[in-house]
Amino acid sequence: MPPRAPPAPGPRPPPRAAGRHGLSPLAPRPWRWLLLLALPAVCSALPPPRPVYTNHWAVQVLGGPGAADRVAAAHGYLNLGQIGNLDDYYHFYHSKTFKRSTLSSRGPHTFLRMDPQVKWLQQQEVKRRVKRQARSDSLYFNDPIWSNMWYMHCADKNSRCRSEMNVQAAWKRGYTGKNVVVTILDDGIERNHPDLAPNYDSYASYDVNGNDYDPSPRYDASNENKHGTRCAGEVAASANNSYCIVGIAYNAKIGGIRMLDGDVTDVVEAKSLGIRPNYIDIYSASWGPDDDGKTVDGPGRLAKQAFEYGIKKGRQGLGSIFVWASGNGGREGDHCSCDGYTNSIYTISVSSTTENGHKPWYLEECASTLATTYSSGAFYERKIVTTDLRQRCTDGHTGTSVSAPMVAGIIALALEANNQLTWRDVQHLLVKTSRPAHLKASDWKVNGAGHKVSHLYGFGLVDAEALVLEARKWTAVPSQHMCVATADKRPRSIPVVQVLRTTALTNACADHSDQRVVYLEHVVVRISISHPRRGDLQIHLISPSGTKSQLLAKRLLDFSNEGFTNWEFMTVHCWGEKAEGEWTLEVQDIPSQVRNPEKQGKLKEWSLILYGTAEHPYRTFSSHQSRSRMLELSVPEQEPLKAEGPPPQAETPEEEEEYTGVCHPECGDKGCDGPSADQCLNCVHFSLGNSKTNRKCVSECPLGYFGDTAARRCRRCHKGCETCTGRSPTQCLSCRRGFYHHQETNTCVTLCPAGLYADESQRLCLRCHPSCQKCVDEPEKSTVCKEGFSLARGSCIPDCEPGTYFDSELIRCGECHHTCRTCVGPSREECIHCAKSFHFQDWKCVPACGEGFYPEEMPGLPHKVCRRCDENCLSCEGSSRNCSRCKAGFTQLGTSCITNHTCSNADETFCEMVKSNRLCERKLFIQFCCRTCLLAG
């Protein structure tokens, strides 16, 4: 296939086929090259791969861990424990079945599903999950790359990006992510990287693939597990250390969950999403199902429950924040609505734009995208600078993989400004503060609530300064309501080319106060369609305000005949609009040339799920005063308005018999209409309630009220106060259940602020130890320490001097190994920086690089780093490919080591072609041709 753009200056690209490089027509065996060229076409015609089953099961067993252990043992399984935070769900393992098989397991152990204590089980399938980094085109590897962080400096005179994300402006206001914890769900992070180590948080890290607490990536020659380390640097690379870059939240804590470097199953994803939800604030994920233009996939049953647990229970009930990359399948015509992770109401789906504000070639369009950041673009546009594997830096990070950690870092700045933001508050803030700026898209529209929105960029480019300023004064939005409109289960044929329209008229659950939705947030369409070629479908939703959301675009590569079964499409384009009215669903079938147009699809059923609030999310209305008859109070009343003209003739009521009995002791001097406390005309002490709740006289006000002696009324305390001295939130004396009394401010809070902890027995916020930034249960039981202290066994210990490390076993500072300048432990393998005259090799400091390595200067490091020579070199100088000696079985050709091997089937003409075209110097061709020729001499 010809290249998509002219090659950049540099080394000559490898030949495409033998016949195009001077080989005569008589050259032998050209069929070898034809076979190679034909392979992609053959592979594309293969049927989709069959599912791969593992020897792991997810099982729901009631009765607790003991019951699960007994059930597992009875059927030959091992119970590996509860799955994350999901009660009654357990991870079973069977050692006597195939580790990986295309057939689901059979045998006596399958009787497990008939056990009466087993409510549900699922043999785990391997899920394909790909890292969302745009593929590099080797034609442009030698193009110049800007080494500065251009996306932080768009205001510079010569910058091509005209609009700022205003990260520096947020920093200038004092927000750098302090006390916020972000975790990267990926292939691990290099915790000893000099730019990550200062902010690395072991408590926010775990290795799900290896089942231990070290999230370090697996190292190999290809460095394929670099993705998580790159994402982590964008969030929280340390500042002012003369190394690599500055992270967006450079004072935030950064952790890593290693979960992509192995079989990814529903259990693996659920465990990863549920790691320490009350400690980790933000989870960032730059991966998902294949972006191949034909896959429809999303979270399984367990992962969905983990998402729900996180938003309900995470961050002490405020909700975990999940940030997701929207996908890189633009070149394949993919649509991110077919990705159940970015299409979820629980995730913040983030898109990308180029430095010029253009649509990147990898971008996927869909209605669930919330916001956008800068990232890479065409080969001539700059990429993103960040940390890289083996303590390096890179200026080549690309794709929407960049955008998710960028937004995670910006949200960390907002959480520092206001740590009481809920997961929905954060989404509202992004909607309010993101802006179209100079982002170019033909589909920008203003929705019914006045928000400008696009399928490419959501609500636009994130604005860090606007986000922190809005967060600082933010009031929590009202509670979320969910209204399910009646499902339309009438099957309808989908006519070819024409548009099938069906409507749903809803009052948005106005009859149910706990479900009523007036102002929209997310709108979900749950739909089932049968169709001979799924990729020919287009689906739109039109709101009562007229906003049109594209739920699905045509996908040329999706030839599946599976259609959709209860698939949920989500749109945020109706955010802030009124929910009540007529909704229109449009389904269009545009048949491709490879399909018989006479075969029609069928819309089986669809339903509408509305999420939002019953009250306006951004305004508070004062309650109207009751116009009904009230008890006479000892305060002056307003004079009634004078009506123009003669007053109307009042009807003369029948005379009622006047009460002459004894009044209640709490009745005042104006008497009563009966003997009870709710029949007084005025009160001795206080009146309680109103005309709707039968106002009565009381001697003292109950809990939740205070006595207004001037008005002789019981007035309600501020929300959360149990006893108080006034209506203000700062006049609380004690708090209701679920709140804690902050004695220094006399307020009632659901979470104690930094520096205080919640005492459950007294329901008080008490001060942590002076060394603690955050603590739990006790003054000295720390989770975060102040500057100058380190966390050890729940206590804050003073930081150690250079050349020493903190020994958590002995609770003191210990000496580093003599080869280390700085370290994390006593052995030579635990150095961070090396002592003078030592080099860094394989995580150790050595006096000289070993055989097969060469020394290289690293900017910002006080020592050299030993780099590995090419795999065939015994030794090299200055570069990995500049071999000076070769391993046994290899011959030196220039600066390369080539296999010293002959084969009887290579004739002189073929070998001459190999030599003349210097194919053996190109690694790609070593296996194809070099082993067939004797090249020595």
Curated annotation (Swiss-Prot):
Residues 476-616 form the P/Homo B domain. GO terms for molecular function: endopeptidase activity; heparin binding; nerve growth factor binding; serine-type endopeptidase activity. Keywords: Calcium, Cleavage on pair of basic residues, Glycoprotein, Hydrolase, Protease, Repeat, Serine protease, Signal, Zymogen. Residues 1-45 form the signal peptide. It comes from the Eukaryota. GO terms for cellular component: cell surface; collagen-containing extracellular matrix; extracellular space; membrane. Residues 46-132 form a propeptide. Residues 149-468 form the Peptidase S8 domain. The keyword Metal-binding does not apply. Its cofactor is Ca(2+). Serine endoprotease that processes various proproteins by cleavage at paired basic amino acids, recognizing the RXXX[KR]R consensus motif. Likely functions in the constitutive secretory pathway, with unique restricted distribution in both neuroendocrine and non-neuroendocrine tissues. The propeptide domain acts as an intramolecular chaperone assisting the folding of the zymogen within the endoplasmic reticulum. This is Proprotein convertase subtilisin/kexin type 6.
